[in-house]
């Protein structure tokens, strides 16, 4: 049985739940300060530590927003899904190998539409004309095939690249959405998934 909470701890917990419901991810410590009238981030950290010890939340101290509600019913009722954020992609390893996972992010299920998906942080500006910018997080549906015109995550020389896919007569063209860049022409390519959405934190 979980230990009882103080009024302030209840207020903080409810704000965290509200923010996850509205935004799909938990608030930063400073946002908790502002919402609950606490002046010091160290005071919030103290309350979060007690909420964790009492079994209401889980945290990863190495990540600033990694607060997870310890209540599976909460996630079911809020109709959200937790997806892995892949930090790196390596040839010969499963895309979701534990050592490749950088974080886990909670998103509304309606935004994703499938559990067979992962998140990947975009590096570079090769897709800016498609509205995909450096440091955006893309939502990728796992699949190993693609249709012409799909934006895909493909593995090239041990590195993941995001490009538009075109299968032509005797080769595959991975087309950037940036007029300053040339397409990548390959005989064959490993498709990791199709891009179905993106997240941009302002």
UniProtKB/Swiss-Prot annotation:
Which ranges of the sequence are annotated as binding DNA? 29-49
**Could you tell me the keywords of this UniProt record?**
Autocatalytic cleavage, DNA damage, DNA repair, DNA replication, DNA-binding, Hydrolase, Repressor, SOS response, Transcription, Transcription regulation
| Pfam name, any one | Peptidase_S24
Extract one GO BP annotation from the record.
negative regulation of DNA-templated transcription
Spell out the catalytic residues. Answer: 126, 163
Q: Which SUPFAM superfamilies match?
A: LexA/Signal peptidase, Winged helix' DNA-binding domain
Xref: CDD domains? S24_LexA-like
Q: Which reaction does it catalyse?
A: Hydrolysis of Ala-|-Gly bond in repressor LexA
Recorded hits in InterPro entries, A to Z, give: LexA (IPR006200), LexA-like (IPR039418), LexA/Signal_pep-like_sf (IPR036286), LexA_DNA-bd_dom (IPR006199), LexA_repressor (IPR050077), Peptidase_S24_LexA (IPR006197), Peptidase_S24_S26A/B/C (IPR015927), WH-like_DNA-bd_sf (IPR036388)
This entry's Enzyme Commission designation comes to 3.4.21.88
Q: Give the family, as the similarity comment puts it.
A: Belongs to the peptidase S24 family.
Under the heading NCBIfam families, the entry gives: lexA (TIGR00498)
Q: What is this protein called?
A: LexA repressor
Q: Which organism is it from?
A: Caldicellulosiruptor saccharolyticus (strain ATCC 43494 / DSM 8903 / Tp8T 6331)
């Amino acid at each position: 049985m979980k230990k009882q909470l103080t009024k302030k701890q209840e207020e903080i917990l409810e704000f965290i739940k509200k923010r996850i419901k509205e935004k799909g991810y938990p608030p930063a410590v400073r946002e908790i300060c502002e919402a609950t009238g606490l002046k010091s981030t160290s005071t919030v950290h103290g309350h979060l530590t007690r909420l964790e010890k009492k079994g209401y939340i889980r945290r990863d101290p190495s990540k600033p927003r990694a607060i997870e509600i310890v209540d599976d019913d909460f996630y079911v009722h809020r109709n959200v899904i937790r997806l892995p954020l892949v930090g790196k992609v390596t040839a010969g390893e499963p895309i979701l190998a534990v050592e490749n996972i950088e974080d886990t992010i909670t998103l509304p299920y309606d935004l994703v539409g499938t559990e067979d998906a992962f998140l990947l942080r975009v590096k570079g500006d090769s897709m800016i004309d498609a509205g995909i910018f450096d440091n955006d997080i893309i939502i990728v549906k796992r699949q190993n095939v693609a249709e012409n015109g799909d934006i895909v995550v493909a593995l090239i020389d041990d590195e993941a690249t995001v490009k538009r896919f075109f299968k032509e007569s005797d080769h595959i063209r991975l087309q950037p959405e940036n007029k300053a860049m040339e397409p990548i022409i390959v005989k064959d390519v490993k498709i990791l998934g199709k891009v179905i959405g993106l997240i941009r934190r302002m």
